[in-house]
């Protein structure tokens, strides 16, 4: 899930993860956005959130500088279980279905790309993402920023699809078009555009925007709750949200 900040991609990621878990799938939720809000959007209190990977200087030194040498292909197979916390379901599982497990890893975003420590953290972050996407036979949902910098070309080859999220505004759509273009340059062609808080009108055909589009209307239940509760789950509109997400997964071929 990628797009301009504030467009609702974290909400969409939280909703999708919860739907998948309620229908029996194990899901890894990866928060790779600067805002670090996927856990709270999924119902976790602030004190239960794990420390972001990019702030774990001990792990960065241990894995990237093991033996005194710079290792840009570190061993990370044990890290997902070490870094993750379990996330409760936001609603009842589908009748007759054993619920899946939702686990959250907070990676954070490397903001000081010129610094050596930041570059080391970025290498470890990319290695963990690559391991989850390439070596685990489970759902992996990544809440990205307005780009796909965390996904190298080798990892993208194993990514099933990209959800580009936008508001119904030209600035937001232009950012979405740039995200789509960058992802296609890496070989990620399976993309769907979700226009969030859409109240009507045609979505403009901008170069770079994904050709397949879904719209999500404003949700009154979410708007009423946002000042008192960070969670976006278990809304009055939950059934309608689930229906839209099922259409999204179908468009992605899942």
Annotate each PLM feature.
Residues 1:
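Hydrophobic anchor at the beta1->P-loop junction of P-loop NTPases
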Residues 107-113, 117-118, 129-151:
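Switch II (G3) loop of P-loop NTPases
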Residues 127-136, 150-170:
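Inter-motif core of Ras-like GTPase G domains
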Residues 182-254:
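C-terminal lobe/tail of nucleotide-utilizing enzymes
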Residues 5-6:
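Walker A (P-loop) phosphate-binding loop of P-loop NTPases
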Residues 19-98:
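N-terminal phosphate/diphosphate-binding loop that engages ATP/GTP or pyrophosphate donors
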Residues 9:
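Conserved lysine of the Walker
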């Amino acid at each position: 899930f990628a797009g301009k900040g504030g467009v609702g991609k974290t909400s969409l990621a939280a909703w999708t993860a919860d739907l998948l878990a309620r229908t029996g799938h194990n899901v890894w939720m990866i928060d790779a956005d600067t805002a670090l809000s996927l856990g709270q959007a999924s119902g976790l209190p602030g004190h239960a959130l794990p420390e972001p990977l990019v702030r774990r200087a001990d792990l960065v030194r241990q894995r990237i500088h093991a033996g005194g040498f710079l290792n840009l292909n570190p061993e990370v197979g044990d890290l997902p279980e070490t870094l993750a916390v379990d996330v409760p379901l936001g609603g009842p599982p589908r009748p007759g279905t054993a619920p899946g497990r939702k686990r959250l890893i907070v990676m954070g975003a490397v903001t000081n790309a010129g610094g050596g420590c930041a570059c080391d953290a970025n290498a470890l972050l990319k290695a963990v993402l690559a391991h989850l996407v390439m070596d685990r036979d489970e759902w992996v949902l990544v809440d990205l920023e307005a780009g796909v910098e965390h996904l190298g070309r080798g990892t993208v080859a194993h990514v099933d699809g990209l959800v580009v999220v936008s508001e119904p505004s030209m600035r937001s759509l232009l950012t979405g078009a740039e995200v789509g273009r960058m992802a296609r340059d890496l070989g990620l062609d399976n993309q769907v555009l979700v226009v969030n808080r859409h109240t009507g009108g045609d979505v403009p055909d901008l170069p770079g925007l994904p050709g397949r589009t879904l719209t999500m209307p404003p949700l009154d239940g979410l708007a009423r709750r946002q000042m008192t509760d960070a969670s976006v789950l278990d809304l009055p509109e939950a059934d309608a949200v689930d229906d839209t997400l099922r259409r999204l997964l179908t468009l992605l071929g899942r």
